[in-house]
Amino acid sequence: MEGESTSAVLSGFVLGALAFQHLNTDSDTEGFLLGEVKGEAKNSITDSQMDDVEVVYTIDIQKYIPCYQLFSFYNSSGEVNEQALKKILSNVKKNVVGWYKFRRHSDQIMTFRERLLHKNLQEHFSNQDLVFLLLTPSIITESCSTHRLEHSLYKPQKGLFHRVPLVVANLGMSEQLGYKTVSGSCMSTGFSRAVQTHSSKFFEEDGSLKEVHKINEMYASLQEELKSICKKVEDSEQAVDKLVKDVNRLKREIEKRRGAQIQAAREKNIQKDPQENIFLCQALRTFFPNSEFLHSCVMSLKNRHVSKSSCNYNHHLDVVDNLTLMVEHTDIPEASPASTPQIIKHKALDLDDRWQFKRSRLLDTQDKRSKADTGSSNQDKASKMSSPETDEEIEKMKGFGEYSRSPTF
């Protein structure tokens, strides 16, 4: 397991000097704490062969710098004045471990302004481990002979301020009886002289390596190049996106125009329905009621196909004379009642009598010609002139007698 803990150490001399100086003032005071932070890892091995590592951070407060006036380095809203801080902490900025506030007759609670100021100081010093020491003196007797001084050290952790254990070192503590030693490096003069001779080739004046600066410069140049390339890529992506949108728009326009052209062609090719030959349809349905084949197509007056479906519509044509039917009773064979249904035929009486009369006269003329072997030409002419019919009508009558009589229309 691995854990962390933080504690602070303050010498009795520093705490006494701090209390004596600020108790002699008439108002609240504040300032900065100087020192160093040490880290120590403690490894404890248990019987279960598991290592228990604990990292202990110790904040050693060694000095303090007072500010004899409030709001000397910040304003009422807690914003830091960098110029004032630069004057106060001219050479000891790296040694700042925290700041303190000497507040009379108040509780050990940080105010909202102090929280904001502490957050701004953390950003200014780039130190998230900055601590805050709050000192609150108070008088406990009416004669002002006895004073009480309470102190607490606060450190922010996950957005909340927690108290850090503060140990005041004095001669009465058993663990502080021995002398305090500070380990220092022992450097020879020859080593120092050699380092100073060649340090200019490898180190800068502040002690940093030159190669590190060169690497940092190269890194910065690479970052600039990367930014420029990213900008170009972004511009190209935007251009491609724009082109894709234009292509999609043109495709939609092409599809729209193509659809309009197809629709126009369809409207152009669509013709009006031709007029149906209703007389032909009615005649087929009248004379051939059981023939579905003859009912399966509909023809127009111009002999054009209208539709493939059968015509089941009754046109209500009761006048059969309009169909120009020429039917003889003797020519149509009689159908048995069981095989075919009776068909009612309508004939015009005056037209039938006329054709019967003409046929009888034609037969008489043929008999006279067969009896006489030789006939006078004058008699032939007289017979021809006496008959009002023409040769064309006679030929029609002959044909009417020779061919089979079937209903025509």
From Swiss-Prot:
GO terms for biological process: attachment of spindle microtubules to kinetochore; chromatin organization; double-strand break repair; mitotic G2 DNA damage checkpoint signaling; mitotic G2/M transition checkpoint; mitotic spindle assembly; positive regulation of DNA repair; regulation of DNA repair. Keywords: Chromatin regulator, Coiled coil, Disease variant, DNA damage, DNA repair, Nucleus, Phosphoprotein. It holds the Pfam family MPN_2A_DUB_like. The modification Phosphothreonine is found at residue 390. GO terms for cellular component: BRCA1-A complex; nuclear body; nucleoplasm; nucleus. Changing residue 403 to A: No effect on formation of a heterotetramer with BRCA1. Residues 362-409 are annotated as: Disordered. Signal peptide: none annotated. The modification Phosphoserine is found at residues 48, 386-387, 404, 406. Residues 362-372 have a biased composition (Basic and acidic residues). Phosphorylation of Ser-406 of the pSXXF motif by ATM or ATR constitutes a specific recognition motif for the BRCT domain of BRCA1. Ionizing radiation promotes rapid phosphorylation at Ser-404 and Ser-406 by ATM; this promotes recruitment of BRCA1 to sites of DNA damage. Changing residue 404 to A: No effect on homodimerization. Mildly decreased recruitment of BRCA1 to sites of DNA damage. Changing residue 402 to R: Decreases formation of a heterotetramer with BRCA1. PROSITE patterns: MPN (PS50249). Changing residue 404 to P: Abolishes formation of a heterotetramer with BRCA1. Does not affect interaction with a first BRCA1 chain. It is linked to Breast cancer: A common malignancy originating from breast epithelial tissue. Breast neoplasms can be distinguished by their histologic pattern. Invasive ductal carcinoma is by far the most common type. Breast cancer is etiologically and genetically heterogeneous. Important genetic factors have been indicated by familial occurrence and bilateral involvement. Mutations at more than one locus can be involved in different families or even in the same case. Component of the ARISC complex, at least composed of UIMC1/RAP80, ABRAXAS1, BRCC3/BRCC36, BABAM2 and BABAM1/NBA1. Component of the BRCA1-A complex, at least composed of BRCA1, BARD1, UIMC1/RAP80, ABRAXAS1, BRCC3/BRCC36, BABAM2 and BABAM1/NBA1. In the complex, interacts directly with UIMC1/RAP80, BRCC3/BRCC36 and BABAM2. Interacts directly (when phosphorylated at Ser-406) with BRCA1. Homodimer. The homodimer interacts directly (when phosphorylated at Ser-404 and Ser-406) with two BRCA1 chains, giving rise to a heterotetramer. Binds polyubiquitin. This is BRCA1-A complex subunit Abraxas 1. It comes from Homo sapiens. The lineage of its organism: Eukaryota, Metazoa, Chordata, Craniata, Vertebrata.
